[in-house]
C-alpha cells in the first residue's frame, strides 16, 4: 500500500492539492529538470492524485520540493488532469498559505522556485498572499482566426507564466450559470488555434483561453479555460498577469495602479505591475483557505488506483 500525504486548499474557489510526501525522489536538479523526471518516469503519481476517484478535473496539484537555492522557502511543481504547468498563480497562493499552516514560514517575503523561474511571494499579516510573478509580455496583438460555428475571432497572445489567447470581443455572457456555453466557445477557439498552427513564442502551445467582460463592481470579469477542459474558478493568476501585459502594452494601465480582476464565480484578485525589459513583472494578491489534510492510499490491486483513465 502506497501512501501520499496531501493538504488541500482553495484560492477563490480553485483547489490546490499540495503533495507533502509520498512521491519518488526526483533528484537535485532545478524544478524544470525534476518536472521532466516526474513526467517521464513517475507520471502515474500525478494521475493518482488528480484524476478520479481521488481528484477531479478542476484540481491543480503542487508537489512540494526542497529548493535548489538556500534562500528559497520551497520548490514546487504544478500539474493538473492533463499534464504539467510551468507556473500557477492561484496554486502559489495556496502553497504559501499552506506552508504557513504547516509552520514552515511566517508573514514576510518568501522565494518559491517553479519550473519557469523563481517567484517572490509575500505572506501578509491577514494571511493573504501577494505573488510577484515571472515576467509577462504580449507576444502578438489582434490575431484573427476562423472558428467553425462562431466565425472570426480576434484576440491577443500573451505569456503570464503559461500561454494565453485573450479575447474581449466574443459575444458570450461571462457568468457562472453560462459555463457550458463558455466552455464550448473557448474549446472551439483552442482547437482553432491548434488547427491554424498559431502558437506562442518558440512554438509554445497556447493551452489557456481567457474571455473578458465588464463587471459592475470590478475592473473586469473573466472566464479561463484551462488545459483539460476545466475552467478556473479563481480569476487565474497567470491569466491576470497576461491581461496586465496587454493592458500595459496598450497604455491602458499604468505601473503600480491596481487592477481588480473578478472570476466567473465572483472571486477577486488585486493585481498591479512594474516595468521590466521587454515586458512587465506582475504582482497578484489573493487569499487561500485550507480545506483538508489527508493520506491518499494506493492499493496495487485497485484497477483504478493510479487514476481512472491513467
Curated annotation (Swiss-Prot):
InterPro entries for the chain: Pro_racemase_fam (IPR008794)
Record: residues binding substrate: 89-90, 208, 232, 237-238
Keywords: Isomerase
GO molecular function term, any single one: 4-hydroxyproline epimerase activity
Database matches in Pfam families: Pro_racemase
Residue numbers annotated as active site: 88 (proton acceptor), 236 (proton donor)
E.C. numbers: 5.1.1.8
Catalytic reactions on record: trans-4-hydroxy-L-proline = cis-4-hydroxy-D-proline
Subunit structure: Homodimer.
Purpose: Allows intracellular utilization of 4-hydroxyproline, one of the major constituents of host collagen, by converting 4-hydroxy-L-proline to 4-hydroxy-D-proline, which can be further metabolized by intracellular 4-hydroxy-D-proline oxidases.
Entries under PANTHER family matching the protein: TRANS-3-HYDROXY-L-PROLINE DEHYDRATASE
Family: Belongs to the proline racemase family.
Protein name: 4-hydroxyproline epimerase
Native species: Burkholderia cenocepacia (strain HI2424)
Biological classification of the source: Bacteria, Pseudomonadati, Pseudomonadota, Betaproteobacteria, Burkholderiales
